[in-house]
């Protein structure tokens, strides 16, 4: 039994089988899937990680302990908690984080090279604190750069490539990543969000919910989002067919809703926006540069029902053109890697004809 689509990646074919001894059910009360280990009688909401699959009894004990600790903290608090978003998330020093950043420095006015120069040292410092405080085991930063291919920026496909590469790399060079955080290069989290990075996402975590620009938009699901491997594969990742700014996050929300995955996020925390634009300014900036926008957004969203399970990780194709380190080695180990990739066209998809970097629809 499997729990997702087949993934025909750039080099290998993988599936998402439910681990031996585990079963999947649907909660009638909450109308969402859960996972059950028959022998230990352990139940959890999220797809089992490799560690959980191999040691369900230990997982059951650990989760019981974490729940007891949270209950003690809640009982001793004078503030009543009404939402999981207001609680301190549970962290584990078994977790390894992959920070996956889509990137291209094509338009000087976007200042992406300047943003990257600030992003790498900040994130290394931020994540190293989580390691030294024993909240996570390890991390690696992956900058996925789209080559100068004369096509519009394809954020969704770059994130899929980053996920695919990071997973394969960590399988060969343990520890295996358990947390995948899809991250914009111009957003710098501050220490008050550290635990939201370190916690295993039993359901997706929209960390950028607290970003000032979109904090009043409940439909926004971009900026910084944390996923487990299992949930990312269940929804077949991001769409590959959104060329230009906008739309891929909306499609991601549709995928979560289709497979009945709920998401969470902090209600407070600090993010420094290197662009330093409010929503009105950003929209005005894009209006002045219409060719950057996705000109197929609405048509691509309309085909969600018929294409979501075959447009994403399942048909991902790309070539790695260059791989380089972006940092000085820490104890002989680099913590930041840039991949320059050829994202390739998507089979015979109709949007291939509308992905040129200067494409605008005819009036």
Regions found by a protein language model. Give the residues of each.
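WW-domain-binding short linear motifs
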Residues: 1-33, 38-85
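Hydrophobic targeting segments
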Residues: 95-101, 123, 140-142, 162
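Short, well-formed alpha-helical segments that are part of the catalytic scaffolds
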Residues: 106-127
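C-terminal catalytic/acceptor-binding lobe
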Residues: 119, 244, 250-363
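Active-site-proximal specificity loops/subdomain of glycosyltransferases
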Residues: 131-177
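Short beta-strand-to-loop acidic/aromatic patch adjacent to the donor-nucleotide binding site
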Residues: 172-190
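Conserved donor-nucleotide/metal-binding helix-loop-beta segment in metal-dependent transferases, i.e.
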Residues: 190-214
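A recurrent flexible, glycine/aromatic-enriched loop bordering the glycosyltransferase active site
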Residues: 210-227, 234, 243-244
